[in-house]
Design a protein with these regions (language model features):
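Bacterial Sec-dependent N-terminal signal peptides
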Residues: 1-30
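Glycan-recognition and catalytic cores of secretory/periplasmic carbohydrate-active enzymes
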Residues: 23-397
């Protein structure tokens, strides 16, 4: 009996020492070569793009028919994606011209740390200064991130349990699913300061969103409107989707990415469960195309002729590479292989622009706001950002 117990004990030790499925999953050498080539091609594209940008202007999109490069100042939500994408490409290529351009663009972005009129400071400041801190740390970056988190927290309502998104109507407390991706900034602020206030705001916002934004099938509304005085839900809408009952693709992507980050930062299993549910909704959806780059809405009219949204695909791809590390067995393999398929597609001529085209942007076929007929089948800077992140995550697997 003692001999049998000894054998069983050794077996348990061996099982515990075995690598997880995520650790055993291997990258594809051919795809790694494709990614490296895509990074070099992307670097060349951005060198064309940077020549067209004054110091205080940031790329948003490009209209092929009119040959118009659309840019913005530092204040819109998209400002941080360009320097962030440059930094990811610098990591992959070691091309210092990309690093220098990213550093040049941090200057005009810096003042946004005090911007209390936007919920998008995570996108704006963590994608830019957060990546800069990770790659080339400077003490001043810490303070920028802390101040940005403070500004974001001024938009938090304890009564509602969320960070306000839009300010267009003070009588309605509007919260969009996109906010989930801004919470990463708050966790960084808690790490930098030791102040748990930021952490608690992020957790409260995520919990409230999980309760009210999601349907029984784990698809998400875009917008939930709360009564600011009582915290009660007044209305649920999908402003950028096909209808209030539809699953806007980028909204599902934001939810997946956000709850994956929530699990990473808290290790609370309910967030892992939520991320898994969202991933399974996406990957099992009958309207998901073979290359897994979604239509702009999973319920879009006109499928299979509806426009794709590569920005949603890029966000989902990057999130799945991370989520695959937190699960095991067949689930990890499913996420990893799906993300590989998406990355392969985005690195192909079907989505990756040919040299000297697309206004210098990397990916084609993004959709900004279909219901408003805005930015349909165009490049989008946030698609580029999450594409460059997905490439780096694959290389670092």
């Amino acid at each position: 009996m003692l001999h049998i117990r000894h054998i069983l004990f050794l077996l348990l030790i061996c099982l515990a020492a075995m690598p997880s499925t995520a650790q055993r999953l291997k990258t594809n050498k051919k795809l790694l070569r494709t990614v490296a080539q895509s990074q070099q091609a992307s670097a060349a594209q951005y060198k064309l793009l940077m020549q067209q940008l004054p110091l205080d202007r940031f790329p948003v999109t490009y209209y092929e028919k009119t040959r118009k490069l659309v840019t913005s100042g530092s204040e819109p939500w998209v400002g941080g994606f360009y320097p962030g994408a440059l930094l990811y490409l610098y990591e992959g290529t070691k091309d210092t011209a990309l690093f220098n351009e990213a550093m040049r663009k941090l200057g005009p972005m810096e003042k946004e740390q005090f911007n209390k009129t936007t919920h998008d400071l995570g996108f704006m400041m963590y994608c830019s200064f957060g990546n800069a801190k990770r790659i080339a740390p400077r003490p001043e970056y810490d303070q920028v991130l802390i101040n940005s988190a403070r500004s974001l927290c001024t938009r938090f309502s304890e009564k509602v349990g969320c960070i306000r998104s839009w300010d267009s109507d003070a009588a309605r407390f509007m919260v969009i699913i996109d906010n989930m991706v801004n919470l990463e900034l708050l966790f960084a602020a808690t790490r930098l300061t030791g102040d748990s206030t930021y952490y608690k705001v992020a957790v409260t916002h995520a919990n409230t969103t999980m309760q009210h934004h999601f349907r029984p099938d784990y698809s998400s509304h875009h917008l939930v409107i709360y009564n600011p005085a009582t915290g009660a839900v007044s209305k649920k809408q999908t402003v950028q989707g096909a209808s209030d009952s539809s699953a806007w693709a980028r909204g599902q992507a934001w939810g997946l990415y956000g709850y994956t980050v929530m699990y990473r930062e808290t290790k609370d299993k309910k967030y892992l469960d939520q991320a898994n549910h969202i991933a399974q909704f996406i990957l099992r959806h009958p309207n998901l195309p073979a290359d897994k780059i979604p239509y702009w809405d999973f319920n879009a009219p006109g499928i299979p002729n509806a426009p794709r949204d590569v920005s949603a695909g890029a966000v989902i791809c990057s999130a799945l590479f991370e989520l695959a590390k937190y699960v095991d067995g067949r689930t990890a393999r499913t996420y990893f292989k799906a993300a590989e398929s998406m990355l392969q597609a985005m690195c192909s001529p079907a989505y990756l622009a040919a040299a000297g085209t697309n206004g210098g942007f990397l990916l084609m076929h993004g959709v900004g706001n279909y219901p408003r007929n805005a930015d349909i089948d165009v490049p989008l800077i946030y698609a580029d950002y999450y594409f460059t992140e997905a490439m780096r995550r694959y290389q670092q697997w």
